[in-house]
């Protein structure tokens, strides 16, 4: 936790002098110069434990910790024709340690994936015609760690209705991934050196429509179609058959997913908002899931608010899942990854937001400090905790 705090403080110091020098713009003037609209500094700490590790065939520790730090900078500029140009630049780095990944090599003191760093930058450009209510966007991203490299791209289109109370959005994303095939030590070919590689591709299309029903109620409908192909197993996951033999996880090379959701926000006066969300999910691996989420931000004073939240999730098992020692040679595909088992889970927590009129630490443009904590509990013996800190410059 000390590392999380120091990282956030160091990033804050980078912008301190600038925040003190820039005057507030209280006019309606739209600057044609590129300027900083918003900066978010986020640090989080995540910890989990369980006893159904897929690395050891569905048994064994799932202990894991992750420290993540991201910086998100949004820049805006208005062109001569009044077009708004937005550039969103984000960079993040995680460091994790995993007791289960340390068991890839059962005889070694430490396996290749027992701890790692992940670096994930992204860049998004939006071109908004405010007069027509139309926005187009394009973005690129990447994610790099020891055994995984991912490159992503997306395009989007949004159009508001004539009365500006509704908005339609279409978005397409693709991710091109490459995995190192780090096999369990006992399944590697004798004398083999290095690791092989395999590809995984994801294509996702999203359609959404949001509508202001009245002064108090807003709703959004969203649907996705997601197609994956390539190597969809994880190479270091073991599967133990009923005869005691050990195998490498084997899954189909295609997967098709359809999530459908609805989101609503209801404003109870000036101080309370009720935010609700429901999602139904299905795929061609016979996994079906339901998610229900509720968050109620309550403004206690002009500068302080609380946001209790709760999420319930339930899913059926994928048709290729069986616990430790239950698969047989008759199974074409097999996994003992409990993320694909039948379970239900709950996630409960609280957010605290502080927006003092004079800014955080007396820095006017650093106007928001938000702390969120959540506890996650799953019916198949997995539990986790996460705490995050977000400091916003605007």
Set out the residue ranges of the language-model regions.
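Transmembrane beta-barrel architecture of outer-membrane proteins
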Residues: 66-70, 116-122, 150-154, 200-204, ...
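Short glycine/proline- and aromatic-enriched beta-strand/turn motifs that initiate or cap beta-hairpins
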Residues: 20-77, 88
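Bacterial Sec-dependent N-terminal signal peptides
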Residues: 1-26
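Transmembrane beta-barrel strands of outer-membrane/channel proteins
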Residues: 41-47, 89-93, 123, 138-142, ...
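Outer membrane beta-barrel transmembrane domains
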Residues: 109-111, 223-226, 232-263, 282-297, ...
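Residues on the lipid-exposed face of transmembrane beta-strands in outer-membrane beta-barrel proteins
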Residues: 71-75, 121-127, 155-159, 207-211, ...
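Short loop/turn motifs that connect adjacent beta-strands in outer-membrane beta-barrel proteins
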Residues: 21-37, 78-86, 130-133, 162-167, ...
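Outer-membrane beta-barrel translocator/channel fold
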Residues: 52-56, 60-65, 92-121, 167-218, ...
């Amino acid at each position: 936790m000390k590392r999380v705090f120091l990282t956030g403080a160091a990033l804050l110091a980078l912008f301190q002098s600038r925040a003190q020098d820039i005057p507030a713009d209280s006019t309606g003037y739209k600057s044609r110069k590129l300027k900083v609209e918003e900066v978010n500094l986020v640090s989080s700490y995540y910890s989990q434990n369980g006893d159904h590790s897929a690395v050891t065939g569905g048994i064994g520790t799932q202990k894991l910790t992750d420290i993540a730090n991201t910086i998100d900078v949004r820049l805006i500029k208005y062109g001569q024709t009044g077009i708004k140009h937005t550039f969103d630049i984000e960079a993040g780095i995680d460091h994790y340690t995993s007791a289960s990944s340390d068991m890839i090599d059962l005889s070694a003191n430490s396996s290749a994936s027992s701890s790692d760093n992940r670096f994930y930058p992204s860049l998004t450009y939006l071109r908004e015609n405010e007069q027509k209510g139309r926005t187009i966007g394009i973005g690129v991203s990447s994610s790099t760690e020891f055994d995984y490299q991912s490159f992503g791209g997306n395009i989007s289109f949004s159009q508001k209705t004539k009365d500006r109370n509704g908005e339609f959005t279409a978005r397409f994303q693709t991710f091109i991934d490459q995995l190192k095939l780090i096999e369990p030590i006992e399944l590697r070919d004798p004398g083999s050196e290095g690791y092989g590689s395999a590809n995984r591709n994801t294509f996702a299309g999203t359609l959404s429509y949001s509508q202001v029903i009245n002064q108090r109620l807003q709703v959004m409908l969203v649907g996705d179609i997601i197609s994956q192909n390539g190597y969809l197993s994880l190479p270091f996951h073991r599967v133990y058959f009923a005869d005691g033999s050990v195998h490498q996880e084997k899954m189909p090379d295609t997967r098709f997913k359809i999530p459908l959701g609805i989101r609503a926000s209801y404003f109870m006066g000036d101080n309370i908002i009720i935010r609700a969300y429901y999602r139904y999910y299905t795929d061609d691996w016979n996994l079906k899931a339901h998610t229900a989420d509720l968050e109620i931000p309550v403004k206690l004073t002009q500068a302080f608010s609380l946001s209790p939240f709760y999420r319930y999730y339930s899913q059926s098992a994928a048709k290729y899942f069986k616990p430790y020692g239950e698969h047989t040679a008759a199974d074409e595909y097999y996994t003992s990854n409990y993320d694909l088992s039948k379970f239900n889970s709950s996630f409960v927590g609280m957010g605290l937001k502080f927006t003092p009129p004079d800014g955080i630490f007396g820095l006017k443009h650093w106007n928001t400090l938000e702390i969120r904590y959540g506890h996650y509990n799953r019916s198949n013996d997995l539990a986790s905790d996460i705490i995050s800190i977000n400091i916003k410059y605007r």
